[in-house]
């Protein structure tokens, strides 16, 4: 009897584990993206592609961790009660998304690097991620700390969707597939990323692939693919697709989206070539001393803003923080450090709630909503 019960328990556990594994793997092959040959056919056309991989203009080390440092970081990220989690539910704004003409200059932040930029009558959606996890699986991987503040179907018509690179927290298969049916806008992506989109059914005539310092026109809006200091990859291969930041040059305003990047000397050239920018969206989170070259810290974000603007003019809106736990720093620390670094440099910073729309030309009141 005991032996039979043990066999039954073991069988039940195995079945449960197998069911969980099947659920974890559901959809994973498609989410991994295109095969290497499809990517290489496009990527190898670039002078920035060498020996089978793209390279940074500024050399960048990936990760430098000893075993104990790795253990501490993993523990911090998996612990249910840790400083990297918010102390209370994250408040959301009621999105104020106009159905009429886009503003001269405004931005609505939806969390992490997802934002709706309005510039001179055009709307641009950056790094759209609406999934619950930034992972090839819907069971494992970094999970949202707050829900999307607006439903994808509630977005107004956009004029372009811009992707910075192919990491899961910036390129989400479910969101991309949904946008194909909901929107008519083209996808502007760095070289090689188009292969992922094609493998997911995005029509070729809606994909614009660009190398660094190449541009595309969306009517009167010039969209320029410019360098970033980072890396790429969705599985075992690394750096076979390009990573980028983006400059938006309208008839009257200029905006810059940093994507995902470490600090780079390229910022000065980007500002000289395409700035000065009236608005910057710059990453401030997921930093760590173990990977200083690929993720800026808040102080470096202020420095980058100074590089691409006219002596710190314009407004800095932080992105790449608050939504997914990708590093063990305290949850609200990026904003506190950003504000402390911005004040002596006289840099104007707006920190919108998820879903909040910011107008750089309108009245500003900085409410410390992140101090939960």
Swiss-Prot record:
Q: What keywords is this UniProt entry annotated with? A: Signal
The positions making up the signal sequence are 1-33
Q: Please report a single Pfam family linked to this protein.
A: Lactamase_B_2
The record's section on InterPro entries has: Metallo-B-lactamas, NAPE-PLD, RibonucZ/Hydroxyglut_hydro
Under the heading Gene3D superfamilies, the entry gives: Ribonuclease Z/Hydroxyacylglutathione hydrolase-like
Is the keyword Repressor in the record? no
Top-level taxon in the UniProt lineage: Bacteria
One GO cellular-component annotation of the UniProt record comes to: cytoplasm
Q: A single GO molecular function, which one? A: N-acylphosphatidylethanolamine-specific phospholipase D activity
Does the keyword Transmembrane belong to this entry? no
| Entries under PANTHER family matching the protein | N-ACYL-PHOSPHATIDYLETHANOLAMINE-HYDROLYZING PHOSPHOLIPASE D
Q: Which family does it belong to?
A: To K.pneumoniae RomA.
Full protein name: Uncharacterized protein Mb0930
